[in-house]
Amino acid sequence: PKSGPSGKNLKAMETITYVGENLFIGNLGHFFVVLSFVAALLSGIFYVKASAEKGTDATLGRIFYIIHALAVLGIFVTLFVIIQQHYFEYAYAYEHSSKTLALRYMISCFWEGQEGSFLLWMVWNALLGIILIFTAKRWERGVLAIMALAQVVLTAMLLGVNILDIYTLGSSPFELLREKMQAPIFSAPNYLENLVDGTGLNPLLQNYWMVIHPPTLFLGFALTIVPFAFAVTSLFQKEYRAWIKPALPWALAGGMVLGAGIIMGGFWAYESLSFGGYWAWDPVENASLVPWLLLISGIHLMLIKKVTNGSTIAAYTLVISTFIMVLYASFLTRSGVLGDTSVHAFTDLGLAGQLMQFVVLFIWLPIIAVTDGARKRWYM
């Protein structure tokens, strides 16, 4: 869990007028986080309303999703500016970057930390959602409602909002270094003059695979929500065959991209001897492989369903399980439970509870979809 200043030290820090801090960029970034959260929430609400009430227009759902996507882009740009401009007053820039890094590794710094990798996932989801607004046609309302729900949960991971001094919701990438750690250096108003450089990117991660492997893998993860959303929407609408045609291209794309990301990880592991060769059966490696195996199996059953109208339950089970296993893999990687057993695991930022809620929520959703009462609430 992250440590912060004690109450006494925090009060002392509040009385100090610090010199040279660029607070505007961080406040702007946090504004974009809040805006993206609220816009995704409103988009989801209006899409659910449009799904539940026949004849209701989905325009407001679309507008708020587009606002959400633009806000996510704003977060991305703001955080990259903080890293690229070496604003070491921000913990994320100080902990993950340095002035000596080449541009390609400075880009890699973006997703070295948990907050940045969540944001990368959000960017891909936002882009996929925009594409679906224009291509999903009659499936748009249900599919985008589910996409918006996922974005609400992911954005909450970045809020960093303290609730009644009891619980902190998310971990903000725009947290100031002096707010995150206790150190005598922060008693000086001009402490920034002594922060000559950041700690830099882990030497093992200064590799060209770090530039292309995480974005590819996260695009693969993001793509798995699309067939999931079509499947769950079809359960709500009781259209057990029609969803296959629009969902299949997305499933194929997800299988190819996620497979490519896993292969890239294998080559990277082979080049970095500390990772144990192409494949070490590391828990995190396995956690990315299982969704891919489920997805490939699901694609085969979707093809059978499309041609013969058979294997209905199996096709649903595998497609839905694929995305749920992606969420479970994220929980294993980021909750700290594998911190002592995997070289790939992140340290715990206190997000284990939120990550588990993410998993449970999307397990609950298809269960509700197959309940007669829930279908009536949505579509009658």
Q: Could you describe each region identified by the protein language model?
A:
Residues 1-12:
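Short, Lys/Arg-enriched N-terminal segments with co-localized hydrophobic residues
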